[in-house]
Amino acid sequence: MKAPKLLLALALASLSAAACSDDDDDGGSPAQRMGVGAACDGGDDCPADLTLQCLDFKGGYCGLEDCAADADCPRGSACVEHEDGQNYCFLICRDKVDCNWTRPADAESNCSANVTFTDGNSGFKACVPPS
């Protein structure tokens, strides 16, 4: 009798977790599905149709630089002023796991609230890759 109840509880828990997610059914935000935030070794590793570049961060970072506002970034990412003086489209996140779908453990991005969004988005966090 305990096994069916346990299975039912697990099924309900997974349905609840899926219902709380703001990601689309096939997983990830539009920006993640486009390749934003992925690790890379060179420009050829990033999807060319979006003009993503392999940015110079540890492990590389498929992204866009020189954005001026969130409107310059794919949905699910935001324009962030980085400490190096450049603006980048970084993924928006809730937790660190949101940042590292396509990154190796030795080059994980951090989900940080200590960033400056060009559009002044307070209360949000962004995936900041390691320098």
Question: Residue spans of the language-model regions?
Answer:
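Sec-dependent bacterial lipoprotein signal peptides
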Residues: 1-18
